[in-house]
């Protein structure tokens, strides 16, 4: 399993956000550390195909196991799990309803490799992010940290090979931050995890 960036570049008008980035990611955790505006989110948006690359060879390429992600189409959506830094919610949705909704959007059906139904996967993820007790509460009343945990759970739906996490511990208290970091560290044994942050301590895993 490999994710390759080859001469990746991105410009917005006259501003060069990324220039000639090349790297090969294999299973493990990779911290993308930088100040706000350093290009972390731009790189993530290119990998998740939420932003178009520069035209032609100037934009470079992104390959998953040797294939350009643009040619993988919808298949790549099942390979990647993305937790954005911010996302709008239907405020009347509960975490459980939101995760069911996201599972449908991602086309997650039937049972996974562990034999779990979608409902069982959702229940397990809610436990992982410590939201079981508020599984049926409206997200509109949640704190910023609780909303972050809902977003992390949706990124993990379907057990993707690649996890892209943009500021995943923002808004969490120290205890929650450590718990989430440790869980992500466990997942990294057989996943490629890109972890964008401006918090230096988030590079440290036990």
Give the label of every model feature segment.
Residues 48-49:
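Helix-to-loop junction immediately C-terminal to a conserved catalytic motif
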Residues 35-39:
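Walker A (P-loop) phosphate-binding loop of ABC-type ATPase nucleotide-binding domains
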Residues 100, 104-107, 111-134:
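Conserved ABC ATPase "signature" region
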Residues 152:
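Hydrophobic anchor residue at the start of the ABC signature
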Residues 56-71, 75-76:
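Conserved ABC transporter NBD signature motif
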Residues 163-166:
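Catalytic Walker B motif of ABC-type/P-loop ATPase nucleotide-binding domains
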């Amino acid at each position: 399993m490999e994710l390759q960036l080859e001469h990746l570049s991105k410009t917005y008008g006259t501003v060069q956000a990324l220039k000639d980035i090349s790297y090969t990611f294999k299973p493990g955790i990779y911290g993308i550390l930088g100040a706000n505006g350093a290009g972390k989110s731009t790189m993530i948006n290119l990998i998740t195909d939420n932003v178009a690359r520069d035209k032609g060879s100037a934009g470079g390429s992104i390959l998953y196991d040797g294939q350009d992600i643009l040619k993988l189409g919808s298949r790549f959506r099942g390979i990647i799990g993305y937790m954005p830094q911010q996302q709008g919610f239907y405020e009347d949705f509960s975490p459980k309803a939101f995760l069911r909704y996201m599972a449908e959007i991602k086309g997650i059906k039937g049972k996974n490799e562990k034999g779990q139904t979608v409902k069982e996967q959702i229940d397990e993820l809610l436990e992982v992010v410590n939201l079981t007790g508020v599984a049926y509460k409206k997200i509109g009343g949640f704190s910023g940290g609780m909303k972050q945990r809902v977003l992390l759970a949706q990124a993990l739906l379907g057990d993707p090979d690649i996890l892209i996490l943009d500021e995943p511990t923002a808004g969490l208290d120290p205890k929650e931050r450590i718990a989430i970091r440790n869980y992500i560290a466990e997942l990294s044994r057989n996943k490629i995890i890109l972890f964008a942050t401006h918090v230096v301590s988030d590079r440290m895993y036990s």
